[in-house]
Amino acid sequence: MKSIKFRLIVMNFLIFAVWGAYLCSLGIYLGSIGMGANIGKFFAIQGIVSLFMPALMGIVADRWIPAQKLLGICHFLAAAFMALAGYMGMRYGSAVTFGQLFPYYAISVAFFMPTIALGNSVSYNALTQAGLDTVKAFPPIRVFGTIGFILSMWIVNFTGFKNGYQQLFVSAAWGLILAVYAFTLPNCPVNKNVENKSFVDTFGLRAFSLFKDARMCVFFIFSFLLGMCLQVTNGFATPFLESFGYYEEFTNAFAVKNSVFLSSISQVSETLCILLIPFFLKKFGIKKVMIIAFGAWALRFFFLGAGSPTGFGLVLFILSMIVYGVAFDFFNISGSLYVDQNTDVSIRSSAQGVFMMMTNGFGATVGSLCAQAVVNHYTYPASKIIDGKEVWFTIGNWPTAWYIFAAFALIVGILFAIMFKYKHTPEKQ
């Protein structure tokens, strides 16, 4: 049993190491090659492919290809296309165009996004075969995914790859290792006798009937609105921190030179704040917990707008990273638990799919594109020569952009408090 737990720990570590190599630093690279105005598109594509690729790969895993093998195939393809994106960056340097870089990146992301769910399936199957309780055994294993994400961020930060195409090669390398490793994992048998389902049932669309319930409808709408916040800091926090490097007085500041490391505090906080959820849900209930999440997002954005790389401003940056854990966990995990407790067992999995679709699909996509429009309005690209090389930064009125994001989260939180009707009963938590 210890052996299978360790093997699943390695798998989860690698899955999220692939993601951590670029998710929080890609914006820096794009900004450095004068492509800052397209950051939103690179992050929106994650939401777009999340709308259909996990469901499609889930069908393939159920009927034709064992989940562990499909996991390996997806990571091999994702790594190959990410390496091609890195090659384009290496070959053309700062002259690389959107058309040369984006297609390879988009295809890579399309094959990567389903692997999170596939990894969960492999884990659940292996733990069940070993006679272990998945509810108790899986969370400690999943924590190592976050550790992999953080370690990958640190590697990219301290090697200096955060500023260049090399981060894409790091992601590809992790992916290739996992592609090989996945084929050694315990077999997940396919169900060749699976019944033919309708299109509606196959894609879990029957769960959309939940929108007929007024309270669930309000919940899902606000899930979409809060989901708009999710990719904002992933896409723009580190380019914002790096923008201070344009100004001589901040060029050597720790927050500028180690922007990705500073950002990783967010992931550490996310890991620790998971431990607070049971207490807060029991004590306050889902409504107050989600209101806290909206408030935390507002503070997250406000602290970024008010901060600076030195002195008390650096303290505000650190506070922004710490409060991210509350903002993310109190919404994503608590919201998922609410859906689980308030839907019929026959559509519970599909309902979770709707929740993820509203947040990481529609919400993240619309949020990325809207955030890009705001950032483009208040900032502009500018370059300077550093060590004989032209480096681009996105500079301008960043604080106003962050304050707009903070105001959005605050207003949506107030509307949620008014419109979401819920009576907390502690004994049900």
Give each language-model segment a name.
Residues 76-95, 295-311:
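C-terminal ends and interior cores of transmembrane alpha-helices
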Residues 288-335:
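C-terminal transmembrane helical hairpin of 12-TM major facilitator-type secondary transporters
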Residues 41-62, 261-276:
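Central cavity-lining transmembrane alpha-helices of secondary-active solute carriers
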Residues 1-2, 186-221, 246-251:
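Juxtamembrane intracellular "pre-TM" segments in multi-pass secondary transporters
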Residues 158-174, 373-409:
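A membrane-interface helix-boundary motif in multi-pass transporters
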